[in-house]
Amino acid sequence: MTVIERFKSNLKGKQNLINFGFILIGLFGCYLLIAWASYSPLDNAWSTASSVTHDTVLNKTGKLGAWLIDLLYAFLGNVAFVVPFVLFSFAIYALIFRIAEQWKWRNLLLQIGSFILLLIGLSGIASVLLPNSAYYLAGGFVGGMLQSLLNGIIGQVGLLLLSTVLMSIGFYFCSGQLLFSLGIQFYQWLFIKKPQSNTILEAANPHLNAQNNETTKSIVANPSENAHVDQLVTHENATEQLTDVSAFTRPTIHGLKSSSTLNTDKTKYNQVNAQPLTDPMMFKIEKKVILPKINMQHPENELTNLSMEQTNSIDNLEIRLPKVHLNTAVTNPEIKTVEHHAQNRPLEMPTQIQPVFDQPITPTISLNVEDQPLDIESNEAQLAEEFAAAEQMRLANMEQRAKAEGLEETFNQIITSPTLTVSINESSEQPTEKDLNPTHHDNGANYPKGYGKTLLHPLLQRNNVVEKPTTPLPTLELLAKNPVQTQQITEQEIFDTSHRLENALANYNVKATVEDVLVGPVVTRYEIKPAAGIKANKVTALANDLARELMFKAIRITEVVPGKPYMGIETPNTHRQTVWLRDVLDSEAFRHTQATLPMALGKDISGQPIVVDMAKMPHLLVAGQTGGGKSVGINTMILSLLFKLTPEQVRFIMIDPKVVELSVYNDIPHLLTPVVTDMKKAANALRWAVGEMERRYLLISHLQVRNIEGYNDKIDQASAMNFPIPDPTWRPADSIGQLPPPLTKLSYIVLIVDEFADLIMSAGKEVEEYIMRIAQKARAVGIHLILATQRPSTDVITGVIKANIPSRIAFTVASQIDSRTILDAGGAEALLGRGDMLYSASGSPEIMRIHGAFMSDEEVQRIADNWRARGKPQYLDSVVASHEDENDSRTNTITELDPLFDEIVAYVIESGVTSISGIQRRFSLGFNRAGRIIDQMEAQAIISEPGKGGKREVLAR
């Protein structure tokens, strides 16, 4: 490439042209500075031009420079030197701080107007305070005009005040904010203080500051509260390098936290760490510390005094303390304070100790046993009183519970039992060394007795025993509270990526500019505006090439940004944040949701929580390869329902071929059947769901409503009227009672299949038919389906399933073909894993990128245990019962034939009618009784099994 071509390439783009203009302004300012430095009033210039001085030019810049500087002196007087200095300084500042990157013409016009006000004010002040020269006025033509116009009206003092006001306004809006910021930063640097003012870019652009008031003012990295001191120093240094992004106007940045939030987080952090950072006695202990053992055997023994000597080495930390012998019934005496004579303050033993000084200091602690006496008798008396009060309170609570459950006699027997009386002599016996040392026990003799109340090892026990909660629903206290996370991204990083992105697109002949930037917890979206005539598919085809040039793992390009005429390019953040389930469930979107079946998925790319309604989906297909976060996403959906709904509102049928994914939910009261791990039983569960769907449709049709919401409203109305609705499908032969049972509200049913591919392989077409029927009809009766698979291939996700399940979620997949199989669109192959997903809602052409919420296995276990403590599940055996089981139950009733059996057999053989409805009409029987007679005839080989159309053949003719 030649020098001319390189020069032309550097001039491409608006920013480069503006920078070139700044260079010209700087050169012109330097030229005027030289002209001002060599100015002579005798030069042949504008104010002194004559034939006498025609050839007299002493100025180093020639006639042009002499004329220009003479004009400035003529108009501004002594203020003329300000113009060349400002032009030169402004050009240098604009090039150093890259003003061209956020250039706007209105800012230039504002600064030009402010500069003119500044010059007018300075000229007025000069005309009042400075004497006139023999060659020009002190304030020039401008100052003289102000004198002649305003001196007679407001006088010299008024003119001075007015000029000062004009100068102050012009100075502030022209460059005053910049100089103030520089002065504050210089002062803070001089006294080694951390800058707290706004950055230079923000100060130099007052309009941008006002425009972006609600955008982030600072970006900080919040270090861990328990980090090492040198890590804290590293974080502080990194924090000082982060700058404000609010003034970065092109592209506009959204999604960064406000300064108030960050300052609040920083204040909390400082409060938590105030003691370790300011206490010189804190030190880091890496050796094993032998905790003190207190001898309470004899009152005459004395408690030790502590003395601490600080040395200059950190080789060994040895603490030797006296032994412990417990004599009384109180086995855990508490030492509240120990006087530390070196500092005359209590010495606390922190659970986690951090160094707070540069040079390590090793404290040597020695304990002497001959200093201060300890009043053992008073402590023992106080502890005995506290123990007695606690024991009385415990017995009172036990008595109240016994009365509530009607077990007063049992309680009295327990209280009066002689085995519970413990003599003081036995409790005060001194324990032997064998008793104090558990390793001396005979493990072999105690092993058959089991572990507490069970013979199972604690780690092999499936469910933890939890006390019954008092709240109607689980609380968020079951989830761990995680530290607040902040974006660790700078304005410079955002601009550099934008600049590299524009250059990378230009390399492929795609002219586009970055207009907006949206910073999220996991990815950052750069919204670009392609030039006229550039098609969107030309940009999307460059995804892999752009990822390679920008050195990202993967990028995703969206053709349409909702509500904007831009395309979106999503790039991964260097420091990825974790989206915690507690943060999503604690959001306003989930707390105040009006959804019938609310499910929290995570957060979108802007960090906003996403909550969907399962009742409106109405079914969901989830696919993604191993490690993409599919199982965690399923757990997130289940836990969202468990936090919001009771077993009366929603019931689950869970199918888990992997055995370990959903087994943690066994025995929660929401289940209709234990978690199904056998694929044959899984097919039976789907078949039961189809039968339940038909039964519900029959009930809904009798109540003349259209869906489950209308049905439940009718039941509520009947309950309010105190007139329950009798079951319209009941027949006298269905039960022993003479009256039909009342109808009750129907709960929603959610079927969850964790590995759909395994189910298809084992059951095949039968399962697909059941799923198709459920997906087509079950929405109105409150039965919803969630299918998850690791293998998004066309033989698993068939066209029939896709047609009936419009709502889909795609986690990370291997290829674009798999992405199109799930979503009918690409993009899932460019996801980042660990919960990164694409969500396609039913009836919406938009595909939303969501970062799935994360929770630990312990949190899932705690929530399941919480529900198990609330009640036991009411399982239905018919859910997983097979045809053979039903046939066995039917054969047990065949021995007792119906009294009308012979008459109906004769009618069937004569007429050939084999349908239940025909038997009902002919003999005026109920549906269930007629069905039983048909089953009895089938068992006796009188009629055949139903064929394809449900028709039976008569075999006994």
Swiss-Prot record:
It is found in: Cell inner membrane. It is a multi-pass membrane protein. GO terms for molecular function: ATP binding; DNA binding. Keywords: ATP-binding, Cell cycle, Cell division, Cell inner membrane, Cell membrane, Chromosome partition, DNA-binding, Membrane, Nucleotide-binding, Transmembrane, Transmembrane helix. One of its GO terms (cellular component) is plasma membrane. One of its GO terms (biological process) is cell division. Residues 607-820 form the FtsK domain. The chain crosses the membrane at residues 17-37, 77-97, 108-128, 129-149, 153-173. SUPFAM superfamilies: P-loop containing nucleoside triphosphate hydrolases, Winged helix' DNA-binding domain. InterPro entries: FtsK/SpoIIIE/SftA, FtsK_4TM, FtsK_alpha, FtsK_dom, Ftsk_gamma, P-loop_NTPase, WH-like_DNA-bd_sf, WH_DNA-bd_sf. ATP binds at G627, G628, G629, K630, S631, V632. Residues 174-957 are cytoplasmic. Consists of an N-terminal domain, which is sufficient for the localization to the septal ring and is required for cell division, followed by a linker domain, and a C-terminal domain, which forms the translocation motor involved in chromosome segregation. The C-terminal domain can be further subdivided into alpha, beta and gamma subdomains. The alpha and beta subdomains multimerise to produce a hexameric ring, contain the nucleotide binding motif and form the DNA pump. Essential cell division protein that coordinates cell division and chromosome segregation. The N-terminus is involved in assembly of the cell-division machinery. The C-terminus functions as a DNA motor that moves dsDNA in an ATP-dependent manner towards the dif recombination site, which is located within the replication terminus region. Translocation stops specifically at Xer-dif sites, where FtsK interacts with the Xer recombinase, allowing activation of chromosome unlinking by recombination. FtsK orienting polar sequences (KOPS) guide the direction of DNA translocation. Belongs to the FtsK/SpoIIIE/SftA family. Homohexamer. Forms a ring that surrounds DNA. This is DNA translocase FtsK. The gene is ftsK.
